[in-house]
């Protein structure tokens, strides 16, 4: 049982204020040079003994795939701000000319979300995310337990979150999961993300526990351009026929990420992904992200 106060809303407001304060002071090079063949896929400007969570991983530039989490680490006291934007226009309804007259969904409003993420301690990050869908707040933690290297073939992160609708006042949905990734040189990242979500269908009061296994990948096709895709099939629980999926093209510019994506739904939290996508639907959207470390 959760005890709800206004502290959650106050905390999120302070967090968003903090990111804009950080932005005013942040200075960062506009681009990252392409590594030579002798350079490793993971690079760092840190001196020995400093927090290696700040190392640049060329195959994994962002904390999200599209909607699923990645295994990217956040250094202690570092932060990140991200905006998710999913337009309301369904590109699979109407003719090409009709969609074009609505600028392919841009004229039909959007579901917008904002996330602030902070490095609480070494290998540990916390985030607060708010999306317009059902006015949902999600509070989120990730512990990066294993990093791929000579002694480990995979990176593994533990995930925990709780989300609530109507500004975190009802329909609470806690979630537990792990994110597992495998980097292939500095060109390819593969992901498997099993997540258990409770109370997925609070309104319907049915199939309250759901397990899904998200699968994703990111391919670096040039120095700073990536192709990204994910699918989120459900293993058990809430069971509409359509699994959520999406694909995207992504551009990295220094500490900034811009991703233009297409999804068969507008959900971005664990609970929303567990409810699946929408049949015969495709929505244009984008993610914008900025790192401060």
How would you name each of these model-derived features?
Residues 205-220:
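A contiguous pocket-lining binding segment that forms or flanks enzyme active sites
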Residues 1-2, 28:
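Short, intrinsically disordered, low-complexity terminal/loop segments
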Residues 2-12:
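Bacterial N-terminal signal peptides that target proteins for export
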Residues 11-21:
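Bacterial N-terminal signal peptides
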Residues 23-26:
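Boundary at the C-terminal end of the N-terminal hydrophobic targeting segment
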Residues 28-167, 171-176, 181-201, 219-222, ...:
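Transmembrane beta-barrel domains of Gram-negative outer membranes and organellar outer membranes
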């Amino acid at each position: 049982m959760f005890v709800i106060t206004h502290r959650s809303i106050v905390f999120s407001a302070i967090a968003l204020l903090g990111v804009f304060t950080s932005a005013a002071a942040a200075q960062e090079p506009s681009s990252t040079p392409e590594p030579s063949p002798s350079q490793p896929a993971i690079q760092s400007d840190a001196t020995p003994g400093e927090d290696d969570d700040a190392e640049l991983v060329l195959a994994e530039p962002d904390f999200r795939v599209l909607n699923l989490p990645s295994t990217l680490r956040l250094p202690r006291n570092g932060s990140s701000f991200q905006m998710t934007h999913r337009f309301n226009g369904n590109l699979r309804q109407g003719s090409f000319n009709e969609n074009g007259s609505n600028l392919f969904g841009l004229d039909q409003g959007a579901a917008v979300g904002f996330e602030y993420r902070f490095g609480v301690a070494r290998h540990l990050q916390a985030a607060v995310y708010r999306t317009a869908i059902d006015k949902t707040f999600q509070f989120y933690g990730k512990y990066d337990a294993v990093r791929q290297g000579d002694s480990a073939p995979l990176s593994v992160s533990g995930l925990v979150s709780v989300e609530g609708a109507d500004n975190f006042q009802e329909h609470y949905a806690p979630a537990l999961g792990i994110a597992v990734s495998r980097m292939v040189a500095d060109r390819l990242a593969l992901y498997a993300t099993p997540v258990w979500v409770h109370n997925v269908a609070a309104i319907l009061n049915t199939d309250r526990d759901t397990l899904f296994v998200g699968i994703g990948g990111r391919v670096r096709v040039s120095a700073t351009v990536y192709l990204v895709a994910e699918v989120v099939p459900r293993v058990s629980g809430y069971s509409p026929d359509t699994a959520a999926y999406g694909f995207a093209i992504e551009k990295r510019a220094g500490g900034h990420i811009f991703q233009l994506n297409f999804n068969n739904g507008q959900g971005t939290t664990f609970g929303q992904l567990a409810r699946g996508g929408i049949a015969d639907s495709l929505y244009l959207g984008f993610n914008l992200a900025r790192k401060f470390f």
